[in-house]
Amino acid sequence: QYSESQESGHNRNAPDKELTTEEFQLIFHQSQTVDIEYDFINITTEMIETERKVSFTIDGKEYHLSLTPAASQSVLPYGTKIKSAIWWTDNDTHIHEEDYSDERWDSRAIYENLEIMATILVRTENGTSYYDGVFGEGIAMKVVRSLPGRLMNIYGANYHFVYDSNGSVYDVVLNGQDEPAVPADMAVNNFYPKLLVLVDYSLFKIFNENFEETVKYLTIFWNAVNLRFRPVQHPKVNIIITGIVIAKNEAAFQHVYRARYSKNSKLVHTGRVIDNGRYFFGTNFDPYYDNYDASFTMASMDDPTGKGGATVIGGICSSSNNIAYIRDVGSYSGVKVATHELGHLLNGQHDSDTTCSEKINDNIYTIMAKQGSTKASKFVWSSCTLTAFANFSKTTSAACLKDTYRK
């Protein structure tokens, strides 16, 4: 075993003021004109075989996290297809192969802790570890970011920024047409939701239009969603990202562009994204992608009604209902909503529509609560949702989930 710790004599009163505009954007995913509340922490690491014992202090409170390698394969396997989309002068969306994949994002780099919902991408160089990821839930959810190389030389490589995620807790599902459940010959014991992830230009801009930063973020984001499904045992759920498409201009994703309330508007009608998507995906993506069970479009635009996401209950294997939309602002704010929407696709209903309560106590709410609490610090699966997943696994509507590759 070994320990890592490093001190620096540099003034740490306002390290954010030493960031360039680009560095500030890449760390906080916001403009430098925004006043950010953050903590500047020194992380020490003790290695015991494959376990990382990480310690740091925030506002006098000591944190001791035990991080272990991801229990399942990373949601973003090496070699995942990554493409870009651009709206061209011929009034059409063009898809381009980016040929961008990196083994740094595979399962060997992801560490986790189920108890505190920590998902951390670890990079080790010259005996020093750098941590990027998220831990905690709800009001207690925090983002940890390593320093850019220039600041490591000033403060020391073990220093990191930590700030609140401000995760979204509100959701309204868009219900589709109910289809009769047809019993399957055999239940599916393991769900492998194969997802096509689309990053709208509104979100890509938050990452400084940087492909590496975007892919890194998506890796952490969807591994965090996957971790929230870990308590589900019947069937077990393991997400696989089979493709990523990143919009390089505003009109590239027409299902989002045409769902805005007005031209040049930063407001979007969540329900229209789903309605528009039924045509958009059939036209644009069938020739490029066939190995996905559902698409998730991620954008940073607001819905004036407060909706954070939308999809169709039980629609994951349906060619017309396997579309989901989530709002995310680059601070993992959409992790809970993405978990919720995938829960809907796997046939979970709002707990308020079942016999289960949405609220365990003031601090704990269910993941499938229609409107969670802004004060909740933990989310759990209700018995009603777990039963819905199990029942879904026994129908032909879940058949596409049994394989890691869609046939």
UniProtKB/Swiss-Prot annotation:
Tell me which Pfam families the record gives: Reprolysin_5
Domain free text:
The N-terminal section (alone) shows no toxic effect when injected into the host. This section may function in stabilizing the catalytic part of the protein, or in directing it to specific target sites of action.
Which one GO biological process term can you cite for this protein?
A: membrane protein ectodomain proteolysis
Regarding tissue, the record states: Expressed by the venom gland.
Q: Which organism is it from?
A: Eulophus pennicornis (Parasitoid wasp)
| Mechanisms controlling activity | The gelatinase activity is inhibited by EDTA.
* Name this protein carries in UniProt: Venom metalloproteinase 3
Cystines in this chain: 317-400, 356-384
Superkingdom in the source lineage = Eukaryota
Tell me the GO molecular function terms.
Answer: metal ion binding; metalloendopeptidase activity; toxin activity
**Subunit description:** Monomer.
Q: Where in the cell is it found?
A: Secreted
Residues annotated for Zn(2+) binding in this entry: 340, 344, 350
- The reply on keyword Nucleotide-binding is no
